[in-house]
């Protein structure tokens, strides 16, 4: 059987489970009203759209989405934008809130518990392979290639991994591997002595939060883990170390299945779990030749499509045209005679006359009043920025009125603006 046909048969035997219940506390006020996977990204998408689009483009069309923390925004997005799969062809996206399977007091206690609480649903669909995905990373990956790698290897678990500098290892689950890619050790966020990639001294393999299991093996692991009172019921801390100890874990480097892939192509994967990382990944898209190609017709990023008129850029009342460079603007935006550079504007943003906006991420339904100056600002949905406001130039004022990171990125929310107006 050739590789194409082999992959075709395999993805029919697989089901994906997207873990989308996390708060993402390091995003601070951006997740006050929504789960991290529901946070806006890239001018028109939500973060979860990337994992779901990877599933569809890879042929994986049996998908469960596990939700918990402040899930209304996420559920509404999935219902509006992801209801096009055809049930009569055994295609679906199941929305899976916490089942309180263990008892009536506990919601999901960890990533492994989130899967365990849906074990009956998984079994009812009868997949041979279960693909467990984090719903909060930005990347493009062909899961069918990883699935084929897993099936051909003979291992019972395969872990997706991305190459990082050793100096960044403290923030990730790091794996040691042998020359055949068998995982020999797995350490969650090591502070020192992180295992390096064979043949290097300064590069490590970090877990991407992507796992493929033989389904029966996964069920056995989860049922054993749930009875362990010492367990935190987490894949990275408990399940994967157990699999490694049983010599059943294979490492799958992201470079083997990233989209696009090939010589000289740097795989693009971003954990947007902090305000700085979120801001940087959004601004990546404003580059002349962005590393992440959202214009690829062969691997589209799907999302909910609100029916809106095109963005419009017009002179102000004095005839000043303004200048817009390296900026993405979604439908329904209107900009009057302002200067905007290297920024992203989500749908229905209004920028009034005389503004100067640089390196900003502006979420839907924001109004920026006349003569504002904004630099390195992330503005949450629905903010009404008063005329003449300056953000991003005075670190002391920014830290007093808003949330400012050590790198100088300022987060502005509707609540912050409302409180400022009351002073």
UniProtKB/Swiss-Prot annotation:
Disulfide bonds: none annotated. Transmembrane segments: none annotated. This is Glucose-1-phosphate adenylyltransferase. Keywords: ATP-binding, Carbohydrate metabolism, Glycogen biosynthesis, Glycogen metabolism, Nucleotide-binding, Nucleotidyltransferase, Transferase. Involved in the biosynthesis of ADP-glucose, a building block required for the elongation reactions to produce glycogen. Catalyzes the reaction between ATP and alpha-D-glucose 1-phosphate (G1P) to produce pyrophosphate and ADP-Glc. It comes from Francisella tularensis subsp. mediasiatica (strain FSC147). Alpha-D-glucose 1-phosphate binds at residues 108, 173, 188-189, 207. Pathway: Glycan biosynthesis; glycogen biosynthesis. It is an enzyme of class 2 (transferase). Homotetramer. It comes from the Bacteria. GO terms for biological process: glycogen biosynthetic process. It catalyses: alpha-D-glucose 1-phosphate + ATP + H(+) = ADP-alpha-D-glucose + diphosphate. The keyword ATP-binding applies. Belongs to the bacterial/plant glucose-1-phosphate adenylyltransferase family. InterPro entries: ADP-Glc_PPase (IPR011831), ADP_Glu_pyroP_CS (IPR005836), GlgC_bac (IPR023049), GlmU/GlgC-like_hexapep (IPR056818), NTP_transferase_dom (IPR005835), Nucleotide-diphossugar_trans (IPR029044), Trimer_LpxA-like_sf (IPR011004). Its EC number is 2.7.7.27. The keyword Nucleotidyltransferase applies. GO terms for molecular function: ATP binding; glucose-1-phosphate adenylyltransferase activity.
């Amino acid at each position: 059987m050739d590789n194409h046909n082999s992959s075709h048969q395999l993805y029919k035997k697989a089901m994906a489970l997207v873990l989308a219940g996390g708060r993402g506390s390091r995003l601070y006020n951006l997740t006050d009203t929504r789960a991290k996977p529901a946070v806006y990204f890239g001018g028109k998408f939500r973060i979860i759209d990337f994992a779901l689009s990877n599933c569809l483009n890879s042929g994986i069309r049996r998908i469960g989405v596990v939700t918990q923390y402040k899930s209304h925004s996420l559920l509404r997005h999935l219902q509006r934008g992801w209801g096009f799969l055809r049930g009569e062809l055994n295609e679906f996206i199941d929305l899976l809130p916490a089942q309180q399977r263990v008892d009536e007091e506990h919601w999901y206690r960890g990533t492994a518990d989130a899967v365990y609480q849906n074990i009956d649903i998984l079994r009812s669909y009868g997949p041979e392979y279960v693909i467990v995905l984090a719903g909060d990373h930005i990347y493009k990956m062909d899961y069918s290639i990883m699935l084929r790698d897993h099936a051909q290897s003979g291992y019972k678990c395969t872990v997706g991994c991305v190459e990082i500098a050793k100096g960044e290892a403290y923030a990730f689950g790091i794996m040691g591997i042998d020359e055949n890619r068998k995982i020999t050790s797995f350490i969650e966020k090591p502070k020192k002595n992180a295992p390096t990639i064979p043949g290097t001294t300064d590069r490590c393999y970090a877990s991407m939060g992507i796992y493929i299991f033989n389904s029966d093996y996964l069920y056995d692991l989860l049922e054993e883990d749930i009875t362990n009172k010492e367990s935190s019921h987490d894949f990275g801390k408990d399940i994967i170390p157990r699999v490694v100890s049983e010599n059943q874990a294979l490492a799958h480097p992201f470079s083997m299945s990233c989209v696009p892939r090939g010589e000289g192509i740097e795989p693009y994967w971003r954990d947007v779990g902090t305000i700085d990382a979120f801001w940087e990944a959004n601004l990546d898209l404003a580059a002349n030749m962005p590393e992440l190609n959202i214009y690829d017709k062969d691997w589209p990023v799907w999302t909910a499509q609100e029916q809106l008129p095109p963005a419009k850029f017009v002179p102000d009342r004095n005839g000043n045209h303004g200048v817009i460079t390296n900026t993405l603007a979604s439908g329904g935006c209107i900009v009057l005679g302002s200067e905007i550079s290297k920024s992203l504007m989500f749908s229905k943003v209004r920028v009034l006359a005389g503004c100067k906006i640089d390196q900003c991420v502006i979420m839907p339904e924001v109004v920026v009043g006349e003569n504002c100056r904004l630099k390195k600002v992330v503005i949450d949905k629905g903010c009404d920025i008063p005329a003449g406001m300056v953000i991003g130039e005075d670190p002391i004022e920014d830290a007093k009125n808003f949330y400012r990171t050590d790198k100088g990125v300022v987060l502005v929310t509707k609540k912050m603006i409302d409180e400022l107006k009351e002073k």
